[in-house]
């Protein structure tokens, strides 16, 4: 089985970004959504990105942001990739000169394969748990058996993952990558070093 990548999302402090990098995480996520307790300012985002060692991908998370707002952030922060976690259409995700992927929320009634196919130019698709009124970071799992096999895009699995269930998740879903935020926190926006290290180690242990 190919190595599964890991992303630690909702990073708000330089020290937490360095913890993730030291643990071997492949990517970190910065939330540019003001309603989130994990939102970061432009200044803090710049500090975090500047502190990272090479080969750690920086992902900016947006929720129904305007094109102007996204461009302003990209002018200020050297992000590698964009994650669209709202109700963005394919056209709204394109044109930023960065690779991007779309988050889709799974609640049980969707045609996941058809939704994935709509985002033809995405680098991948992230599947998260549907909770009404909450775009992400719910801390709840969805039924992984709802994921169709052989999706047309690399799959990033999110939603309620922890060090205790990630090995089972990988074995069942066989995703390209896993994405975690609340499952490695001491409190909202503050990461727990032991939880981060344990999570990444267990992701890497799955063969």
Swiss-Prot record:
Lineage of the organism: Bacteria, Pseudomonadati, Pseudomonadota, Gammaproteobacteria, Pseudomonadales
Keywords: Amino-acid biosynthesis, Aromatic amino acid biosynthesis, Isomerase, Tryptophan biosynthesis
Family: Belongs to the TrpF family.
Matching InterPro entries: Aldolase_TIM (IPR013785), PRAI_dom (IPR001240), RibuloseP-bd_barrel (IPR011060), TrpF_fam (IPR044643)
Pfam families: PRAI
Enzyme's top EC category: isomerase
Protein known as: N-(5'-phosphoribosyl)anthranilate isomerase
Recorded catalytic activity of this chain's protein: N-(5-phospho-beta-D-ribosyl)anthranilate = 1-(2-carboxyphenylamino)-1-deoxy-D-ribulose 5-phosphate
GO molecular function terms listed in the Swiss-Prot or TrEMBL record: phosphoribosylanthranilate isomerase activity
Lineage: superkingdom: Bacteria
Pathway field: Amino-acid biosynthesis; L-tryptophan biosynthesis; L-tryptophan from chorismate: step 3/5
Source species: Stutzerimonas stutzeri (strain A1501)
NCBIfam families xrefs: PRK01222.1-4 (NF002298), PRK01222.1-6 (NF002299)
One GO BP annotation of this record: L-tryptophan biosynthetic process
Amino-acid biosynthesis in keyword set: yes
PANTHER family hit by this protein: N-(5'-PHOSPHORIBOSYL)ANTHRANILATE ISOMERASE
